[in-house]
Amino acid sequence: MSNKIAILLLAVVVAVVACAQAQPSRRHHLVHPLLPRFLPRLHRDSNGHRVVGGFQIDVSDAPYQVSLQYFNSHRCGGSVLDNKWVLTAAHCTQGLDPSSLAVRLGSSEHATGGTLVGVLRTVEHPQYDGNTIDYDFSLMELETELTFSDAVQPVELPEHEEPVEPGTMATVSGWGNTQSAVESSDFLRAANVPTVSHEDCSDAYMWFGEITDRMLCAGYQQGGKDACQGDSGGPLVADGKLVGVVSWGYGCAQPGYPGVYGRVASVRDWVRENSGV
């Protein structure tokens, strides 16, 4: 009898281990925040992403777009809010000295042209969670005021909790990878993607973690178009308003996995209180 019990217990243990291995890790196929569309997107990737399946644009088509530079190398995207403030993702600035950061504006290339402006200070959302990538927002105050032109303009912000209906077409832009691999783009690119309902996005990412109320998803069910590493912190714009900040995702442009963005309307009051915008 004791041998039968031992065999039964061993079978149960093997079954449990096999089941655990068959289910995706909730946090490890995330893209690292800074890898995540910083780097790997999902891995709850937050590193940087490059637009996959998109098209090249001139910066005048997205004059609010900036390249966030870390020691003179492109790290993330960002959006101009006014002549002193830029919004990006918290995973793009966390733990970095502002003196090591600068933003390039008014150029279709992240490595040259336009204007390079230093960052005076960063204000990350106090509730940012690097494990869940929740509240993935960071404000950057610039060292000098910007001069607006056809190539440099602020983006309009939504009202607090202003809704975005599922299926709304939005444009994501950046210099991130043009494939899930590590091939990045020197020239600004964009892609048009439909927003996805909170319910459908939650179902897609059920094994990777919660899609919170501070998140907005966009992408095609069949994949093919998405933000990618290097695009983190960059803009998702719908009807002329900044509705999302590139945050994380599973790979890039993978079927069944829309891109996950920080939902700007959810922190509209925080942006106003900390930047005056």
Curated annotation (Swiss-Prot):
Enzyme Commission number(s) of this protein: 3.4.21.4
GO BP field: digestion; proteolysis
Disulfide linkage: 76-92, 201-217, 228-252
Gene Ontology cellular component terms for the protein in this record: extracellular region
Site (Required for specificity): 226
Keywords of this entry: Digestion, Disulfide bond, Hydrolase, Protease, Secreted, Serine protease, Signal, Zymogen
Main EC class the enzyme belongs to: hydrolase
Subcellular location: Secreted
Protein name, entry field: Trypsin-2
Lineage: Eukaryota, Metazoa, Ecdysozoa, Arthropoda, Hexapoda
